[in-house]
């Protein structure tokens, strides 16, 4: 077990904002990152960027002071998922996720793989229902539950397996906090500041609404990454959240 970056080497942020990076060019991504302050947000690296640029890109972001949510949504047989989660922990990321639909044995194996990392283990989060999915999409998969009901079923399984929380839509957050308690972390994509384009998300909410709903961490992408002044945009979002708290 070799941690590449300890939390003590990175900036401390109390912001719930996680900026979702979405770049095809590594230099463009780093150019954007160099415009913002790690005290104002964390960063999310997904499948495309990790496939293009690899673990070294994550290390470069960490060296700039950022906590990293490695959003790879592992979904495999238990042993493979466990090894993947342990590899993410070795990389020193702040958060990593798996698909709850992988089942209880897979999620339990992933959680157990993090035990050797102790306090340096990343948060382990499960994905419930992707925010782009509607009831008709679930019906195509043979799921007759609504997105909200199916997400709650998967969230209950996630908590039973001892994970730290779930990725869910902001609309589900109020219910989830009531059912699963304050310590069960809720991570929400589809967050758009007032006036932003909805993009490819179907179930969206503003940062202020998300905070009021009980969201712990909110992923915000293009409204920040495509801003002419991303640092100021982040500061404005954080200021509005502080006023709403």
Curated annotation (Swiss-Prot):
Belongs to the OMP decarboxylase family. Type 1 subfamily. Keywords: Decarboxylase, Lyase, Pyrimidine biosynthesis. It is an enzyme of class 4 (lyase). Pathway: Pyrimidine metabolism; UMP biosynthesis via de novo pathway; UMP from orotate: step 2/2. Its EC number is 4.1.1.23. InterPro entries: Aldolase_TIM (IPR013785), OMPdecase (IPR014732), OMPdecase_AS (IPR018089), OMPdecase_bac (IPR047596), OMPdeCOase_dom (IPR001754), RibuloseP-bd_barrel (IPR011060). One of its GO terms (biological process) is 'de novo' pyrimidine nucleobase biosynthetic process. Gene3D superfamilies: Aldolase class I. This is Orotidine 5'-phosphate decarboxylase. It catalyses: orotidine 5'-phosphate + H(+) = UMP + CO2. PANTHER family: OROTIDINE 5'-PHOSPHATE DECARBOXYLASE.
């Amino acid at each position: 077990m070799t941690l590449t970056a300890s939390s003590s080497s990175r900036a401390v942020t109390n912001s719930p904002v996680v900026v979702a990076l979405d770049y095809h060019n590594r230099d463009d991504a780093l150019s954007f990152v160099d415009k913002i302050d790690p005290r104002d947000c964390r960063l999310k690296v997904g499948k495309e960027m990790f496939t293009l640029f690899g673990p070294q890109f994550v290390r470069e972001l960490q060296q700039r002071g950022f906590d990293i949510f490695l959003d790879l949504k592992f979904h495999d047989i238990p042993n493979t998922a466990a090894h993947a989660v342990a590899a993410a922990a070795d990389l020193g990321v702040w958060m990593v996720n798996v698909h709850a639909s992988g089942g209880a044995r897979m999620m339990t194996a992933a959680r157990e793989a993090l035990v050797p990392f102790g306090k340096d283990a990343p948060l382990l989060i499960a994905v419930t229902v992707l925010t782009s999915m509607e009831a008709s999409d679930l019906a195509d998969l043979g799921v007759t539950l609504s997105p909200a009901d199916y997400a709650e079923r998967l969230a209950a399984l996630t908590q039973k397996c001892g994970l730290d929380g779930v990725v869910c839509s902001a609309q589900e957050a109020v219910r989830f906090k009531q059912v699963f308690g304050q310590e069960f972390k809720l991570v929400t994509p589809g967050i758009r500041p007032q006036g932003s384009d909805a993009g490819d998300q179907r179930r969206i909410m503003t940062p202020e609404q998300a905070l009021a709903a009980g969201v712990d961490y909110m992923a915000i992408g293009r409204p920040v990454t495509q801003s002419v002044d991303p640092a100021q945009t982040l500061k404005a979002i954080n200021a509005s959240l502080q006023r709403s708290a």
